[in-house]
Amino acid sequence: MARSRTAGRCNPFAFYRVPVTVFVTLIYVALLAPIIVVHHILPAVPESDVEGLDLHEAWRDLQHLTNGFHPYNSHKNDEVRSWLLTRIDEIVSTNVKDAKQQDGVRTFVFDDNQSNLTVVQSNLGVYFEGTNIIVYICGQEDDKREWWKEPGLSPSGKGGVLVNAHYDSVSTGYGATDDGVGVISCLQLIKYFTTPGHEPTRGLVVLLNNGEEDFLNGARVYSQHPISKLPHTFLNLEGAGAGGRATLFRSSDTEVTKFYQRSPYPFGSVFSDAGFKLGMIRSQTDYIVFEGDMGLRGLDVAFMEPRARYHTNQDDAKHTSQQSLWHMLSAAVATTEGLVSDTSHDFEGRPQGPGKVPSGTGSGAVWFDLFGTAFAVFEIHTLFALSVTLLIVGPLTLFITSIILANQDRMYLFGISVPVDDGFGSVPLRGWRGFFRFPFIFGSTTASVVALAYLMAKINPMIAHSSEYAVWSMMISAWVFVAWFLSRIANFARPSALHRIYVLTWMFLLTWVLLVITTVYENRDGIASGYFVIFYAFGTFMATWISYLELFSLPKKSDFANKVSGQISSRPTSLGGSRLLTPSGESVGQHPEDEEPTESTSLLRGQRTSFANYTRPVEDDGDGDLLSTGVSTDVSEARDFNVYGYEQPWSANLPKWTWILQFLLIAPIVIILIGQLGLLITSAIHQTMQDGSSTLVPYLIIALLTTFLFMPTLPFIHRYTYHIPTFLFLIFVATLVYNLVAFPFSGNNRTKLFFLQEVDLDTGANRVSLTGIQPFVSDAVASIPSADGQNISCIPKMDRTECSWESSLVPHVITHPGSEKEETPLNEWVKYKATRLEPGSQNSNRAQIKISGLNTRGCLLHFDKPITRFHVTGSAIDSRFPSNPSLEDGTEDGVREIRLWSRTWGNQWVVDAEWASDEDVNNEEDTLTGKATCLWSDANTQGAIPALDEVIQYSPDWVAITKLDAGLVKGSRSFEV
């Protein structure tokens, strides 16, 4: 029986325009809103302290730690180190009554002033003397001997846990989140695990390393301390942003990642881990030393936004929060507690290389959070197995279902017509209608947002720096409006009940191809960044299969054809009724006008005018029901109200509610995974363009994520009413205009310019440079008084532009400004002595260079041609860290620069160097030339570096000044030997 028109309009679950518009919109809003809230609103700090922790104390410690710049090469760094040793002593002495007593936790503090190391990497040599602070809290199952006191002795047992943070900052940042919060979290971990009742089962090593900011030196030199043999797992606490949530950057394996699952507020995605593996993220953390060089298995937890404050004077306590501190601290406590309580043998086994700890090998991990409260972790092998299964089962299931439908004569897809008996010809099915819609609509919508990405990169490439949500709004509104507009046009021109099944079939094909690609990466490279594709493909497969199963509810094609032919033969012939049939061969050439005229025949040929055969217009009421205007005709009487609009008549029996199930299978999980991933990626990259990264990539990523996020609407969007798309069109126009004309920076979203002052100590030449993105770096230089009237030289430097000028502002880095001491002559800032040595057994070109600098702990030697070998007197050598050029490390061309770091001020380094002979000259003329340079990085005293003070004072408020190199000031002298 035909459904009544009123019943159809009152069904809130039917596949009509109002239910589809309301339901789809509500699902998107209901899921995207909490995703955005979770991303930006941090968990509240507990009203009362957690046992073993003191959050008020932690916040006060952070404020004290960040009261000045404290890079390795600064006197403030020494003050911070002394303060940390004092705080650790206070914590340990308060919690540990006596290490000899039963009720005390055995704790040892190592003030490491002995470890040093030489490392060569990427044609750069580094010699570093460490000043790390190491706290060892003994575990219940640890070796009771003080084995570290005996050279060559190793600990017994299952291995311990390392928690690391670095206490040095950059020379232009206070280091609140890079890495102050990590350091304070370590202090609280010491407090927590030395509190009675919290004694660890495995030993806990807390490392506060010094010298991370320049080449990860502190972590590398930690490897030389005997206690480094104990830990098999680690947790690295880092800051690559300046606040917000601490995210799980990367992990070594599934087994160790499961302990992060204990965090009360987990946050992160394996996508970031893939970014490091694929080289998309160029900067590194101490994680690479512990996991790659030493063979530990662990986690990298770090702040990642906002990048505009990273390494600037806004990385301070004022611009972070207690909520950020609590977010990292709570994760650190939960994760560490799980690791030190583990009694399994999961982290024992063969070392991953010579000299590495015997931590065994774990399985690749897939992990992501859900709304910042739940955390999914499983093996990449599981993802691979599920992917392969879906790749096989999905197409096979649809193929078998299609065969069954064809055998039952219910395969309406691709059907053109069905022949009927009695000479009526064939009944059209119009089964191809809607087949080509998805490629056209999907291609057009995707092309539109990709075109917008290129437009932004061309006209206003930096707008995403401060207005990332305006870019998102523009992309989303454009995509949805174009998709709706094209779908409505297609549905108006050629209405089809097969729109949904065809679109879903195309979507399944697309996700199947994407799943093939991600499966290859999972198996070949261990990269799981496409984890969301399997959820996408599975939901799309299930929704597509439901559409195929819906076809079983339709009559057989032959029955439908016979029914149509029977209806037509049982009533007077009409023009409207005849259109349901395709003429047979016998009826070709027969026309109504060939019949015998009667009194009802129209005076105009081919047109009947009697009331009995009057054809009326039929209108759509907007809910899918058809309203007649006039007296019923043969056609309208035969029309089934279960048929939506002018779609195929045979679609009357299709279920009206299954679309909801299909949408719920596809959309929610896609919205959650893609929505969270989109915000995570946007936060990580939208402010990286100032560092010289591609200006196009962020916009392309947002465009593609928009496509993935809203593609689940394509099977249903042709049922949308015009209200929301029209509103989105207005949003698109407004955001497009804004994104094209708005200035991309502000006081809260500053662009970074990189400062360096270079002084030629031989000639007295003094040059200041700012490096950044054009035209903004030139605009900033124009505001500097000392640059006014100077010859500004702007040259490309990597992916940025360096603008430099001669400056009259001489740095006062040897004596404090206002000191009564006389200024030290420039040529005494750096002292060196280069002596040629007797030819060796393997090389005739050998020299010894001694270098020292006043009031500095960092110098370097730059060679005009590469050296093939060098050695710093007193340096340790470790096979895990190459100390000379080698083919395996890509440094076979030699070393061009050696950086020298000392824990003492004014130290003299002695470097022996060898270089290859030049075939064009004899040995006596084969000289080695270069520069002896020292670095000064202490900007805590006003007037010490007047050029820096001036740049900070007079730069526009949308500019942040940060350091370009290891030193803010570089003083150089030329040498030849």
From Swiss-Prot:
Swiss-Prot/TrEMBL site (Transition state stabilizer) positions: Y310
Matches recorded under InterPro entries: Fxna-like_M28_dom (IPR048024), M28_fam (IPR045175), Peptidase_M28 (IPR007484), PFF1_C (IPR053975), PFF1_TM (IPR053976)
Subcellular location: Vacuole membrane
Glycosylation positions in this chain: N113, N116, N749, N791
Positions bound to Zn(2+) 2: D178, E213, H311
Residue numbers on the Vacuolar membrane side: 39-383, 460-469, 522-525, 681-696, 748-977
Annotated source species: Talaromyces marneffei (strain ATCC 18224 / CBS 334.59 / QM 7333)
Protein name: Vacuolar membrane protease
GO MF: metal ion binding; metalloexopeptidase activity
